[in-house]
């Protein structure tokens, strides 16, 4: 009988943290053993299951990851860049693998993550949904066929509380397109604003961003020529698809030694 993968969750009280815990509890191959919050959080010592409304599960909220080093196999982190880098230090010190869903990293921070992947195994993804990762493949193929003849625009929609823009997923879509077209995403992007913007440059990716209400996530990529237009859209109805993908990633990376991976590795795309 295979042992369950023991998982630690950071930010367990947030929306994504709650979804992750519920999915872990429903997955026969995983087991929640650690729930980590910031120092001096008012809920430290309380049962996380009771706090998120699923009843007591025997896991007490803690702010001390180091004393829990023998209690988990993989850490899942959906917090903020500064917090993620601190958790990476712990994982590196105790040789624990990590799944990172945090977005908004700078190039320098990504380089730090890459350096840690020489010592532990890391999965980092802007979006853990199976659907969005299939979308990446569709975008790649479409760009290969009609990219040079199209104006390409990415439209992304998220809830009003999302703090980074464009979304990590939108930027990853942009990277997929840029690699095919041999463009530099940082230099070849348009972020629409008011005023006289001039004629649209054909060799650019346009980004449009909406923050409103409780939108979980919607991404549309438009390929527009003078004769026709193709739209490819992915809409997330809830966050459970992200949670399932993150748990699947944790199970996949459990026995890995070192390396930097993403969802294309997990899904064998």
Swiss-Prot record:
InterPro entries: DapB_C, DapB_N, DapB_N_CS, DHDPR_bac, NAD(P)-bd_dom_sf
Entry-linked Gene3D superfamilies: Dihydrodipicolinate Reductase, domain 2 (3.30.360.10), NAD(P)-binding Rossmann-like Domain (3.40.50.720)
Pathway the protein acts in: Amino-acid biosynthesis; L-lysine biosynthesis via DAP pathway; (S)-tetrahydrodipicolinate from L-aspartate: step 4/4
Sequence positions that bind NADP(+): 39
Catalytic reactions on record: (S)-2,3,4,5-tetrahydrodipicolinate + NAD(+) + H2O = (2S,4S)-4-hydroxy-2,3,4,5-tetrahydrodipicolinate + NADH + H(+); (S)-2,3,4,5-tetrahydrodipicolinate + NADP(+) + H2O = (2S,4S)-4-hydroxy-2,3,4,5-tetrahydrodipicolinate + NADPH + H(+)
Keyword Electron transport: no
The entry's keywords: Amino-acid biosynthesis, Cytoplasm, Diaminopimelate biosynthesis, Lysine biosynthesis, NAD, NADP, Oxidoreductase
Residues the entry annotates as binding NAD(+): 11-16, 101-103, 125-128
Superkingdom classification of source: Bacteria
The keyword NAD belongs to this UniProt entry's keyword annotation: yes
GO function terms (MF aspect): 4-hydroxy-tetrahydrodipicolinate reductase; NAD binding; NADP binding; oxidoreductase activity, acting on CH or CH2 groups, NAD or NADP as acceptor
UniProt-annotated catalytic positions: 158, 162
PROSITE patterns: DAPB
Positions of (S)-2,3,4,5-tetrahydrodipicolinate binding: 159, 168-169
Transmembrane residue ranges: none
Protein location: Cytoplasm
Subunit structure as annotated in this protein's UniProt entry: Homotetramer.
Function: Catalyzes the conversion of 4-hydroxy-tetrahydrodipicolinate (HTPA) to tetrahydrodipicolinate.
Homology family: Belongs to the DapB family.
Name used for this protein in its record: 4-hydroxy-tetrahydrodipicolinate reductase
Natural source organism: Buchnera aphidicola subsp. Acyrthosiphon pisum (strain 5A)
